[in-house]
UniProtKB/Swiss-Prot annotation:
The keyword Amino-acid biosynthesis does not apply. Signal peptide: none annotated. F-actin-capping proteins bind in a Ca(2+)-independent manner to the fast growing ends of actin filaments (barbed end) thereby blocking the exchange of subunits at these ends. Unlike other capping proteins (such as gelsolin and severin), these proteins do not sever actin filaments. May play a role in the formation of epithelial cell junctions. Forms, with CAPZB, the barbed end of the fast growing ends of actin filaments in the dynactin complex and stabilizes dynactin structure. Belongs to the F-actin-capping protein alpha subunit family. GO terms for biological process: actin cytoskeleton organization; barbed-end actin filament capping. The modification N-acetylalanine is found at A2. It comes from Sus scrofa (Pig). This is F-actin-capping protein subunit alpha-1. Keywords: Acetylation, Actin capping, Actin-binding, Cytoplasm, Cytoskeleton, Phosphoprotein. Component of the F-actin capping complex, composed of a heterodimer of an alpha and a beta subunit. Subunit of dynactin, a multiprotein complex part of a tripartite complex with dynein and a adapter, such as BICDL1, BICD2 or HOOK3. The dynactin complex is built around ACTR1A/ACTB filament and consists of an actin-related filament composed of a shoulder domain, a pointed end and a barbed end. Its length is defined by its flexible shoulder domain. The soulder is composed of 2 DCTN1 subunits, 4 DCTN2 and 2 DCTN3. It comes from the Eukaryota.
Amino acid sequence: MADFEDRVSDEEKVRIAAKFITHAPPGEFNEVFNDVRLLLNNDNLLREGAAHAFAQYNMDQFTPVKIEGYEDQVLITEHGDLGNSRFLDPRNKISFKFDHLRKEASDPQPEEVDGSLKSWRESCDSALRAYVKDHYSNGFCTVYAKNIDGQQTIIACIESHQFQPKNFWNGRWRSEWKFTITPPTAQVVGVLKIQVHYYEDGNVQLVSHKDVQDSVTVSNEAQTAKEFIKIIEHAENEYQTAISENYQTMSDTTFKALRRQLPVTRTKIDWNKILSYKIGKEMQNA
């Protein structure tokens, strides 16, 4: 082990550690971090060298965070990244400091937002919040309005998770939707992601994503937001249905084919006989 450590540079160790961290299953960041910490055995190197991995993980996972003094949770995403570990909460018009290791928010400060897109963002945010409340038992969303390459763009992010470590599984749903405000119609682009980890008596992961394209009629803010949500609802329902159907098919065919129909002896086991033999033997020994 010592020879191996001598041959591997600190840079390579950090690269490997960062890879483990960015691929941590949802809800298991701390477990992976602690394991990597033991393997690396150098806290300073890990914190300094892999800090970008901590940030990337939280942004990729749409990590929700509660800001003290504010009711709604906000998602940590690349769209809200202001640099220097500060992030935007467009709903409350504030920025805040985010600790990527502790996953805690602090130092909320007022933040200027694009006033020309205020009504568009608020209409989409209001419609999306109602949708998420109806469809996700533990869901959160954040809507951004930005100028990207000179185009006024709405970006909607959704996150929902269920962490059940006592039952040996964790899962997260993420979706991201964009459209540009370009009347009379605009292209809607979305990506849907599901990641589930089940690890009781085994280690099984579901990692799935789907890209979606559609178009929305751009009229006034409220009507466009309504049509935008209809597209999201249809695509997400369709995706969830397809996932369920695929699992049923796999259960009926693929997984069934993996199971051995008969033991190696090619003879079915008569469990009742085995039980009677065992009882008889125990009675003999009594």
